[in-house]
Amino acid sequence: MVGVAQLVEHSVVVRDVAGSSPVAYPKFSPLKQGPKEGDIPMIFDVVVEIPAGSRNKYEINHTTGEVRLDRMLFTSTRYPYDYGFVKNTLSLDGDPLDALIMLDEPTFPGCVVSCRVIGMLNMTDEAGGDDKLLCVAAGDVRKSYLQDLNDVPAYELSEIKHFFEVYKTLEPGKSVQGGEWVGHDEAELEINASYKRYTDGHK
């Protein structure tokens, strides 16, 4: 469907240019008690910091918006998909909640992508909880079949998990533990919890 979008309170309303009925997709529901069967997927913004295929670790300054090259990965690994963070969230390690977006083409640092989640990789690093959301672009019809982890090939999940388990291996003072996949419902609950941590810290 080719359409135009507009914000209406907490929703994005997409209207078909041909004039069919509008469909509202919720942007974010911070107090949601967990997904229920038949729910419209939660849509949220992810800011890309590192494009797919890069060994460069870029970080965006949340105050100035500047993109800084933090380092090149010490290992020979490369980011499997675009990697960034969910806006207005706070993870257990004190940073915004991390997200990996399954796009067919890389974007660029600072690009904002409306996403929906399909699962999450529970991890811990030297700073604490370091969970990684696995997302797709909300409007990508090619990925519409991806709704939960069961829809992703098992080998691809293993590749992604392996990357996050080893990409810090050669860096002094860095460590990674864990690496267990959880599904869509658990991931949405963590998004809401991260959003609440952020809002509680900015009252």
Q: Which residues are covered by each model-predicted region?
A:
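Compositionally biased, low-complexity segments
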Residues: 7, 16-17, 25
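Hydrophobic N-terminal alpha-helices or hydrophobic patches in metabolic proteins across all domains
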Residues: 31-203
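N-terminal hydrophobic alpha-helix used for membrane targeting or insertion
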Residues: 5-8, 76
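Cationic, low-complexity basic patches in intrinsically disordered or flexible, solvent-exposed regions
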Residues: 7-10, 28, 33
